Amino acid sequence: MPETRTIASSLGGYLRTRRALVSPADVGLPPTGRRRVPGLRREEVAELVGLSTDYYVRLEQGRADRPSAEVLDALARALQLSAAERAHLYDLARPRRGAASRTEAAVRPALRQVVQAIPSTPALIMNDRNDVLAWNPLAAALIADFPQLRPHERNMARRIFLDPDARQVHPDWDEAARSTVGMLRMAAGRRPNDPALVRLIGELSLGSPAFRTLWATHYVHEKTHGPKRFRHPVVGEVALRYETFQAPGTAHQLLVVYTAAPGSPAEEALTFLGMLTRA
């Protein structure tokens, strides 16, 4: 099982993988001949940030003092980090005191009622560990038969990486896998001592070579909105879009709502599945 701080949320590993994605030309540096590794060299990052090379090396090696906010902001600019990547950098370098070591496992009854009251489109509540905590009938009909699954099986990361039918259910499996790993990376940065999260990462690392490969990239992803396709044994491929909303009164629970374009085959498929759930 991975060590919490060194694998689940390694600042050094994160910095190394991020600088490998930035070329000298991206940041206005002149080419300097053949390079043994892609991306920026350590001394180039140090120069861009205004640090000594020695300090930056110690930062990547985990031997430096806690970096200031000014240093982290400069690193984020030099490495061209997105908002989610910048937030993850801060989580790794400056852990928040008093941050919860666990995520909420229970859904408020009123919030469950909200999910159940969404009649014509799939909706569910999940946490940042990818545990599905509540769902409506259409979500169970389209995505997975959640009522028939044991609680630990209602985890989308397990289903993506350990279910042999995952590539059939998710036509865009590569993107689904990458975004799932990115969500877990973000969660690990926020809560490196979450025992359930550490166990999940260990289980996926042992059971899935694809997960191990993606985990090593240190990719981070914040689930917000976008396209999503499912393949269903009865209605075939269903192309939807999803939107996520932070569940009120929670830190890490998301309401995810999937919608179909009006008049589309996907809308017809959802209508048919809805009829089946009411039959």
Placement of each model-derived feature along the sequence:
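A short, Lys/Arg-rich alpha-helix, primarily the initiator
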Residues: 1-40
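Recognition helix of helix-turn-helix/homeodomain-like DNA-binding domains
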Residues: 32-36, 42-43, 49-66, 74-76
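Short amphipathic recognition helices of helix-turn-helix/homeodomain-type DNA-binding modules
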Residues: 1-16, 67-110, 128
